[in-house]
Regions:
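Outer membrane beta-barrel transmembrane domains
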Residues: 117, 127-128, 216-217, 223-299
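Transmembrane beta-barrel outer-membrane domains
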Residues: 82-86, 132-138, 174-180, 196, ...
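Transmembrane beta-barrel domains of Gram-negative outer membranes and organellar outer membranes
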Residues: 21-164, 181-188, 192, 236-240, ...
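Detector for outer-membrane/organellar transmembrane beta-barrel domains
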Residues: 176-247
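Structural signature of outer-membrane beta-barrel domains
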Residues: 79-81, 111-113, 161-167, 206-212, ...
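Short acidic, gly/pro-rich beta-turn/loop elements at beta-sheet edges
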Residues: 84, 103, 116, 151-153, ...
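Bacterial Sec-dependent N-terminal signal peptides
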Residues: 1-25
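Surface-exposed cleft-lining segments at the edges of enzyme active sites
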Residues: 128-132, 165-176, 208-216
Length: 299
């Protein structure tokens, strides 16, 4: 036992020595860093344009009402961007209760694989020299409250979201390693019925805020927005929309995207295919396949 402890101590000391001797001259030369300059963490830009596709995503556009069923979703995504192709596996749990007046939602990326070029690496001030690796994403917790539903006034729902700082590989510019929060109101109105054709326009307006590494302005605040429409026929639905947010720093913090979702419901299950097309400050083209299990909500 004593010999084993000695071996472990020697091994740990060796790892510490090797880590201390790691050569960062390539990063220093690429960015003109000299002794006395701010540390590398201050060089990274905490905005969606300079991080991975899952770092500071635009929150999902909600539709003004709480869904009837509990949902468990497993999704596989492929993010296409020249110089930074990324793949991930994510999950979501949605639980309505109190007669569908309140719901909680939890979601996040379980596993992310990336492989970016030297150009992307240097543009983002990444410390990941070869630009290839894996990461775990941030996890999100949200609460939804139904304010109005099926009245003369449009369906109205309030949502508050908290983002944890659980994402890994900040040094590789994959995740922000900072907390964030947002709140929004979403609205919708139904026209027609699913048996013939249901048309449901919806919109969202809110506020999004996240911590940064800027010592003078440690928080970035943004206006959150979105609008779209559901076209539903029996068990099929198609939803085009656009969404984004406007950060006040204007340093790559104003992502805008188009969203398209085709969804099929069957036997308390559903399948979904989504396509997201980045327009500004988030330029990925994302394809996501989801399988959803549905259960009755909690009374």
């Amino acid at each position: 036992m004593k010999r084993l402890l000695i071996i472990l101590l020697v091994f740990a000391s060796t790892l510490k020595f090797v880590s201390a001797q790691e050569d960062w001259s390539w990063w220093n030369d690429a960015h003109g860093w000299e002794s006395g300059d701010p540390g590398w963490r201050n060089w990274l830009i905490i905005s969606p344009a300079y991080l991975g596709p899952n770092a500071l995503p635009v929150p999902e556009l909600k539709k003004g009402f709480i869904e009837e069923y509990m949902e468990f979703e497993l999704a596989v995504s492929n993010h296409f961007l020249s110089g930074d192709p990324t793949q991930d596996i994510s999950g979501r749990v949605y639980i309505p209760f109190a007669q569908n007046k309140i719901a909680v939602e939890m979601y996040g990326v379980f596993f992310e694989h990336y492989a970016y070029t030297e150009e992307i690496r240097d543009e983002r001030f990444s410390r990941d020299e070869n630009g290839k690796g894996y990461a775990i994403g941030d996890f999100y917790f949200s609460t939804h409250i139904q304010l109005f539903k099926n009245r003369a006034f449009p369906n109205t729902m309030f949502r508050a979201i908290l983002k944890t700082a659980s994402g890994t590989n900040f040094e590789g510019a994959r995740y922000a390693d900072t907390p964030a929060y947002s709140f929004d109101f979403s609205f919708s109105k139904n026209y027609g019925s699913p048996e013939s054709l249901l048309f449901r326009p919806h919109a969202m307006l809110g506020f999004y805020s996240w911590q940064t590494n800027d010592e003078l302005n440690l928080q970035n605040d943004a206006l959150l927005y979105g609008a779209g429409a559901d076209f539903q026929k029996n068990n099929w639905s198609f939803t085009p929309s656009f969404s984004g947010y406007l950060g006040y720093k204007n340093n790559g913090d104003r992502p805008m995207q188009l969203n398209f979702e085709l969804r099929k419901e069957y036997n308390k299950k559903a399948i979904s295919i989504k396509y997201q097309h980045g327009l500004h400050d988030w330029l990925y083209k994302t394809v996501r396949f989801s399988f959803i299990w549905k259960l009755n909500g909690i009374e």
